[in-house]
């Protein structure tokens, strides 16, 4: 079996994985004032925040190119790849996952699977890494898919944002529109649910209480097993430091990965968002 893993630019990957020849990534465009940008090509993350601050309109995103994925699958076939696993931004907040399922019929020479990751960022990157590791350990394609599904089912993320407008106006928050007029008195905690949708999980009165509640939720989640934890933020280093300190003060003794949301996810969450991702160790 020669396996390729395809993901998108919302997945947080360490440098060694970005350079791995078996991993391929599709860029997701960010549109600001009718100009199209691709992070890492013609847009740095600092440029993104500056352009977002300067614009009177909220930025938008589009889906990766279907034709680019179709062409990539053809290229992989010509290079002798026999199997492909595609892991992309959660189907609950992007239509891309639903739109690509037909491609398996277009390339019958490759055995492929596009499971819904139901997540993004660091947890998505963890899935990509694990799939590659399992393949190189000699696991069969079906065994990899079974283990991957277990990881998907036990992975989640909880989020606190400064401004719900980005999520609601972008159509990425399933049950948040009723909160828009009430943000002065509450600080909602959001989560990725079982369908990969971002939903309101709890309403907390202040940011400090919400941060403490995030730690309580995390400790409850990891009580029944071994998990990798990541703190993820969009230009909110002070909040990330505070959340890490609260975690350590609560008795959490494991390594905590800290990463930044890329431009695509920051488009939907806005500046100042803080989150933690939880992924099982399998």
Swiss-Prot record:
PROSITE patterns: DEGV
InterPro entries reported for this sequence: DegV (IPR003797), DegV_C (IPR043168), DegV_domain_contain (IPR050270)
Source species, domain of life: Bacteria
Domain called DegV: residue spans: 3-280
Keywords from the named record: Lipid-binding
Binding-site residues, hexadecanoate: 61, 94
Any one Pfam family match given in the protein's UniProt record, by short name: DegV
Gene Ontology molecular-function annotations: lipid binding
Summary of the function given for this chain in its UniProt record: May bind long-chain fatty acids, such as palmitate, and may play a role in lipid transport or fatty acid metabolism.
Record-given protein name: DegV domain-containing protein M6_Spy0690
Organism: Streptococcus pyogenes serotype M6 (strain ATCC BAA-946 / MGAS10394)
């Amino acid at each position: 079996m020669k396996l390729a893993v395809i993901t998108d630019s919302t997945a947080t990957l360490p440098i060694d994985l970005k350079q791995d020849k078996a991993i391929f990534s599709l860029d997701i465009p960010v549109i600001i004032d009718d100009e199209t940008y691709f992070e890492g090509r013609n847009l740095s993350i600092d440029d993104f925040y500056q352009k977002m601050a300067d614009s009177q309109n909220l930025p938008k995103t589009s889906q990766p190119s279907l034709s680019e994925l179709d062409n990539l699958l053809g290229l992989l076939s010509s290079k002798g790849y026999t199997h492909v696993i595609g892991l992309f931004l959660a189907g609950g907040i992007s239509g891309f996952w639903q739109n690509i399922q037909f491609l398996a019929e277009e390339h019958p020479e490759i055995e492929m699977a596009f499971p819904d990751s139901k997540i993004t960022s660091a947890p998505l990157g963890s899935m990509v890494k694990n799939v590659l590791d399992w393949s190189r350990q000699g696991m069969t394609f079906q065994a990899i898919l079974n283990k991957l599904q277990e990881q998907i089912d036990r992975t989640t993320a909880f989020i606190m944002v400064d401004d719900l407008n980005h999520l609601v106006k972008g159509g990425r928050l399933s049950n948040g529109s009723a909160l828009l007029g009430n943000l002065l008195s509450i600080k909602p905690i959001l989560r990725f649910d079982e369908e990969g949708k971002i939903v309101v999980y709890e309403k907390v009165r202040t940011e400090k209480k919400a941060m403490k509640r995030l730690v309580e939720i995390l400790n409850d989640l990891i009580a029944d097993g071994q998990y990798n934890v990541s703190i993820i933020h969009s230009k909110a280093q002070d909040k990330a430091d505070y959340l890490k300190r609260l975690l350590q003060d609560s008795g959490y003794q494991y390594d905590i990965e800290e990463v930044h949301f890329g431009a695509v996810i920051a488009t939907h969450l806005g500046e100042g968002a803080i989150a933690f991702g939880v992924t099982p160790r399998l």
